[in-house]
Amino acid sequence: MIAHLFTGLTNLGTAPVLLLLVFGMAVGMFVGMLPGLGVVLVLTLMLPFVYHMSVLETVSMMLATQSGVYFAASITAIVLNSPGAPESFPTTLDGFPMAKRGEAGKALAISATSTWMGGWIACIIFIGLIQLAGPLATVFHPPEYMAIIILAIVLIAQTGNIPLSKVYISGLLGLMLSFVGSDPVTGVERFTMRMPTLYSGIGVVPFALGVFAITQMVKMYGSQKAVATFDQAQLGKGFQAQVRAGIAETFKKWHHVARSAVIAMLLGLIPGIGGFTANFISYGVGQRVSKRRDEFGTGVPEGLMSAEGSSLSKEVGSIIPAVALGLPSGLGMVIFIAALTILGLEPGPTLLKGSPTLPYSMMWIMAIAGLLSCVLGLLLAPQLSRITGIKGPYMFPFIIALAVLGSFADVNTTMGIYLLVIFSILGVVVRDLGYSVAAAAIGLVLGGTFDDNVHLTYSLYGWNFVTRSPLADIFLLVAIYLIISAGRRWHKNKKAAMRQAAKHPLMEWVFDLVMAVFAVTYFIVGMGYPSQAGQIPVVVGILAAAASVYRLIIDFPVWLHSRHVDGSDLPQGGLAVPKPGAETEIEPVGTEGLAVAVITRMEHDDEPETKKDRRHQNIREFIGILWFAGTAAASLVLGFKIGVPLMTFVYAMVNKDLASLKKRVVFAVASTVVTGTLAYAFVSLFHLTFHGMI
């Protein structure tokens, strides 16, 4: 084993292999900072070049690209609240709040150091586990998959400071969306409204871009503010001090990174689980065991370490089932296995025997890529942090253009743009009402896999799986324990929950009513499908209807009370709000036993101080949505090459946020050139021929 370990390293000591490793990192980081493209797209585009490359050159380029994508995705998650890849959703929970406080440098340093440290810890574990690859990967069957997905959904419900019922409604909404499309077991088309473009389901990318990127841009456009305020002093000595503090804190609290790395590494061994689940479970476990669990989601370094410690380690773990059994843990590994097949290699025992040093070379590539990620992240941190100082109206056209192009790239039909518009409006609403888009995202991503494995489990074992699968029993017992403990805390604070106040009482009650009607309709439609195709959607619809009715009962008296009391200064969850900047103890009122009870400095950068300011911000947010919808419509009617730059130019010229005509002209020309170049490159790259989009 030791000989193979060192041989695997020396095999990388050729110029082509090292150059392709650096090239892959650079391409991956570029793609990772463009929401909507993703690792699958860039790896797929690399496949044609594989025919002219050696095995080590191919492996070096593709694995380094994956590492670059996932690291760069965390950068946009921190500075823009827009993860470049779905796997980086947990990073937004604490990374973006840190950036809003002016700690982007510290957050980026923690992210870079945690990524490197977690990846190297996983590489050490890899050395011991590669010998046990076969037995470890074959332990998981449909019951285990089903149980671990249930555990993942329950864990995400424990994260953040959002009322438990709202988290479950969000997760159930994500599950309901995941069942749209052709049922993989029976082939029945479910909830498609007879639209062929929905037969393949709802993509994660339009959802993520809508509820994260566009929603954030609309909010920033409405407030006319940047993510944070950065002056030259902060980007000088003060900024470097932030970076040093971030590195030092990561080493001081290394156990948070190590825990996430081990969890993600082990989850990476499970074929089909993917990095999304691994990252969320690592973050959820980190919160459960942390002394600052109640502060997770408010911008604590421990939360960011828990999220980023798993970023690279899960990719290291996914190598083992890919090369030992030919079983991918995610879509990225599907493309990687395809590349090995093109080169004449058959993943499995034959590969391990015929090329025993190859897995170790893969491990070294990931280790080197992790180190490069850390170094590049720290070197670029000052420049990347400047993004947070750009005001919303200036960033708006660029993010809108990327979102429209990215949504179409993911679905490859105009349905991607329609979905983007729908989810953007939904994102603005649910953000104001305090629902969890993260829970909805994990429901959307895991819903299909959960549905498949429930069917397989019941078909193979019936209810006997409880006695045949001890590992599944353990996962289910942990999930049940978490639900019961949350229920006990809710019962303890039940009266406080019933007195819950809301920032928008009437709007919240109307949303509850709409969700209840939607869930009941979903349940009724699901009843019309064959039993195998409709069982899980019907159960999910019933649960969503029950949770929505529960929210109706809670929110109705709150709305009645708000008609007599000015509740404009009460935020979602019924927390008493002090004046901005004041230090105070927050009393949990409406979070059903899962609230924060911490002493913190309140930040309300996005919240207007008066009713007049609030009305002005709401009007600007509505205008922002109209600009976004106009860009989407122009792209559909005129094509990307014309529609995107045209709307960018018009936006810049009529934008009153730019005081002088000269500034408007300069910004209009510059932004039009940038977005026009992006659109032209996009069209040329994908050779689109749909509805004249070339």
What is each PLM-predicted segment?
Residues 56-60, 97-114, 291-304, 331-334, ...:
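Membrane-interface alpha-helices at helix entry/exit sites of multi-pass transporters
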Residues 109-222, 342-481, 485-489:
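Membrane-embedded alpha-helical modules
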Residues 491-637, 655-694:
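Flexible extramembrane loops and terminal tails that flank transmembrane helices
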Residues 1-58, 134, 138, 189-300, ...:
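Helix-loop-helix hairpins and the membrane-proximal interhelical loops
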Residues 335-360, 385-391, 563-573, 591, ...:
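Membrane-interface interhelical connector segments
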Residues 44-49, 154, 172-177, 282-284, ...:
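Hydrophobic transmembrane alpha-helices of multi-pass, membrane-embedded glycosylation machinery
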Residues 33-45, 74, 84-89, 269-281, ...:
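Transmembrane helix boundary and interhelical junction motifs in multipass membrane proteins
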